[in-house]
Design a protein with these regions (language model features):
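N-terminal glycine-rich phosphate-binding loop for ADP-containing cofactors
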Residues: 1-266
C-alpha cells in the first residue's frame, strides 16, 4: 500500500481496502493504512465501510495482511502432509471438516479458489517475507498449476469435477485424522500468535478476521486458549525437533505466554 501511495500527489489519502470473495456475501473487510495514511483518511474509510454493514478489521501493511498470512498453513501444511505420504487429498479434507469442523477441506478450498491463484499468492508471500520457510510453496501445487489442473474452473484440480468422474473416498481413520487436524491447527495457531506478536492486528481483530473472512469454526486464539497454549507449544516443539526446519519454530510470544501462564482471553 505504501508503494502505491508514493506515486500520489497527496500520499496521506492512500489506504488499502481488502474484500473477500464473493464480496457481496462475505462480511469481512480488511483496512490497511500505509505509513503515509492520515488519521482522517482512516476514519472516513472505516466509517464508510461500517456503514455498508461490513465487519472491518485494521491491519498492518505487511504481506498477506491478516487473513492471507495467518491462513497459509491451512494449505501449506496440508500439502506437506500429502507429500510425506501420510494421507491423500480426500482423507486430509475429511480430517479438517469432520474432525476439525472447517466448512471446506484445504484441497477442496484450493480447487475452489483456483490452484493458479492460490499458488501465486503463496509464492508472492514467500518472496515478500524474504523466503521465510514458513511460507515455502509446494511443488505439488506448482505441478498441478503447470498441468492446468486449476480446480473447479478447469474441471480438474486435486479432485476431478468432470461429468461422471469418480473421486477416491477418504480413509476415515480417527487416529490419523486427529493427527492431521492437530498438525494443521497448531501451525495455524502459531501464525495467529505471531501476528499478535508482530502487531499485525489486535487479538480480537485477528480472531474476527479468521471467522468472518474465511469462515473458520472459531477464532484461532480462542482455540489456543481452549486447547491450552502449553499443549500447542509442545506439539510445535516436537515437530521442530523432528524436522529441524525453521517453518516449525514457535512464536516467541507463545513461549513467553506459556512461561508466564497467560491466556489470550479470560
Amino acid at each position: 500500500i505504501a508503494s502505491i501511495g508514493a506515486a500520489l500527489q497527496d500520499p496521506s489519502k492512500i489506504i488499502g481496502i481488502h474484500f473477500f470473495n464473493p464480496a457481496p456475501l462475505m462480511p469481512l473487510v480488511e483496512i490497511i493504512p500505509a505509513v503515509q495514511t492520515s488519521e482522517e483518511t482512516l476514519n472516513i474509510s472505516r466509517s464508510l465501510i461500517d456503514g455498508w454493514g461490513k465487519v472491518t478489521v485494521l491491519c498492518k501493511d505487511t504481506p498477506g495482511f491478516i487473513v492471507n498470512r495467518v491462513a497459509r498453513p491451512f494449505y501449506g501444511e496440508a500439502l506437506r502432509i500429502y507429500e510425506e505420504g501420510i494421507a491423500d487429498f480426500a482423507t486430509i479434507d475429511w480430517a479438517m471438516t469432520s474432525i476439525g469442523g472447517f466448512r471446506m477441506g484445504p484441497f477442496t478450498l484450493m480447487d475452489y479458489i483456483g490452484n493458479d491463484i492460490n499458488y501465486t499468492v503463496t509464492e508472492t508471500v514467500f518472496t515478500a517475507f524474504y523466503f521465510d520457510p514458513r511460507y515455502k510453496p509446494s511443488f505439488t501445487q506448482k505441478r498441478h498449476s503447470e498441468a492446468g489442473y486449476l480446480g473447479r474452473k478447469s474441471g480438474r484440480g486435486y479432485f476431478d469435477y468432470r461429468e461422471g468422474a469418480a473421486n477416491p473416498k477418504p480413509i476415515e481413520d480417527a487416529v490419523v485424522g486427529q493427527q492431521i487436524f492437530d498438525r494443521i491447527l497448531v501451525m495455524l495457531i502459531n501464525e495467529a500468535v505471531d501476528a499478535v506478536f508482530l502487531n499485525i492486528g489486535s487479538k480480537d481483530e485477528i480472531d474476527l478476521a479468521m471467522t468472518k473472512g474465511v469462515n473458520y469454526p472459531k477464532g484461532l486464539l480462542k482455540w489456543a486458549d481452549e486447547i491450552g497454549l502449553e499443549n500447542v507449544l509442545l506439539k510445535l516443539e516436537a515437530m521442530f525437533a523432528e524436522y529441524g526446519e525453521d517453518r516449525y519454530r514457535p512464536s516467541p510470544l507463545m513461549r513467553r505466554m506459556v512461561k508466564n501462564g497467560e491466556r489470550f482471553f479470560e
